[in-house]
Regions:
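Membrane-interface "cap" regions at the ends of multi-pass membrane proteins
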Residues: 1-15, 74, 203-210, 226-231, ...
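Hydrophobic transmembrane alpha-helices that form the core helical bundles
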Residues: 55, 74-107, 114, 118, ...
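Extracellular/periplasmic helix-exit of transmembrane alpha-helices
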Residues: 41-55, 198-206, 221-223, 241-271
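Hydrophobic alpha-helical segments and their helix-loop junctions in multi-pass secondary transporters
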Residues: 142-169, 183-200
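Juxtamembrane transmembrane-helix boundary signature
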Residues: 6-7, 34-67, 79-85, 89
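Flexible loop linkers connecting adjacent transmembrane helices
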Residues: 19-22, 47-72, 100-102, 208-210, ...
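Transmembrane alpha-helical segments of multi-pass small-molecule transport proteins
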Residues: 77-80, 105-127, 143-147, 152, ...
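Loop-to-transmembrane helix boundary motifs in multi-pass membrane proteins
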Residues: 72-73, 110-115, 283, 287, ...
Length: 333
């Protein structure tokens, strides 16, 4: 397992958790079918990004720059600036979510944990190698399984859950359609495209024959290229399946607890974790908070966010696994 698993886990960021929690709290299981709808779409899109990197040895951002003419490049430049700004705001929100999650676990003040998380992330990105960062991501993806445990603990009517999962239910009203768009938007996020492509390139650089320029499949032996293609396809499939299982679990958990007790307005993932306590117990609430902290601290956008800003902008010139002296543009971004 590699980029696919990490990318899938990074999709379940605090904003995504809050959106799924709101979907479950406001409409119960009515939006659960979106987990089934988005699953093949995520697999297809992320596999395209992954295959592009494998076939060309080039990142998605660099390919876009090469593909478009001068006018297109200008538009792309504006979009990349907007991406960096959006990611900076997302980093701030994610770090605040770290504090909220740890505070719910009675681990200390939220502002202190936000500072600690920011410091650790910065240190790891500056000092650590990409191999160490990727290993931490893969190892700590398991913390997101907390949401699956919560869903199992609070759900009693699995027949109803399965029915809502496979049979779409659509309400033609403004709030439902707005939440539907929010769920689809937070599940299939554009930064995942860059993350998948760039993570694959970094992994290719770590290979013995990789070096500073990743070797595309066309320059490798047919047998090796075929094995790598099969492995990457499985990696993406497992990663996107894992991501949607977490989405499924969050919607089910909040539907079975908050919605059934007429709590329908959830503004943040931390609020959802706190609201679960009276109905699901302290253990389930703590697991939900643990999942929130994991979504921020480990395999989610709060760590990749600085990198995911850098990769589209500097993918042709730098990489996390390069020597520190060779990648000042990355650190600047």
């Amino acid at each position: 397992m590699g980029p696919g698993l990490v990318t899938g886990a990074s999709d379940d960021d605090p904003s995504g958790i809050a959106t799924y929690s709101q979907a479950g709290a406001q409409y119960g299981l009515s939006l659960l079918w979106t987990a089934l709808l988005t699953w093949p779409l995520m697999v297809a899109v992320q596999e395209i990004c992954d295959r592009t990197a494998l076939a060309t040895g080039t990142g998605l951002g660099e390919l876009a720059v090469k593909r478009f003419h001068r006018t297109g490049r200008a538009v792309l430049g504006v979009l990349l600036v907007a991406l960096v700004v959006a990611n900076a705001l997302n980093i701030a929100a994610d770090l605040l979510a770290v504090g909220s999650g740890m505070q719910l676990l009675d681990a200390g003040a939220s502002w202190l944990w936000a500072l600690i998380a920011g410091g650790l992330i910065t240190a790891l990105l500056v000092i650590g190698s990409f191999a160490r960062i990727a290993f931490a991501f893969k190892l700590l993806c398991a913390a997101l399984l907390a949401y699956l445990v919560v869903a199992v603990l609070v759900t009693h009517q699995w027949g109803s859950v399965l029915g809502h999962f496979v049979v779409p239910h659509v309400e033609l009203n403004k709030s439902y359609l707005q939440l539907l768009v929010a769920v689809l938007g937070t599940t299939i996020s554009p930064y995942l495209f860059f993350w998948q492509s760039a993570h694959r390139l970094e992994e290719m650089r770590e290979e013995p024959e990789g070096g500073s320029e990743p070797q595309p499949l066309g320059k490798q032996s047919p047998a090796r290229a075929q094995r790598k293609e099969r492995a990457s396809r499985l990696d993406v499939f497992v990663g996107m399946t894992f991501s949607n299982l977490v989405m499924f679990a969050i919607i089910v958990a909040t539907a079975e607890t908050l919605h059934s007790h007429h709590i329908t307005n959830i503004e943040s993932a931390a609020q959802a974790a706190k609201a679960l306590k009276p109905f699901a117990g302290h253990f389930a609430s703590a697991l939900f908070a643990l999942g929130l902290s994991a979504a921020v601290c480990w395999p989610s956008p709060s760590w990749p966010a600085p990198v995911r800003s850098e990769w589209p902008v500097c993918s042709a010139r730098s990489g996390v696994s390069r020597a520190r002296s060779a990648k000042p543009p990355s650190f600047t971004v």
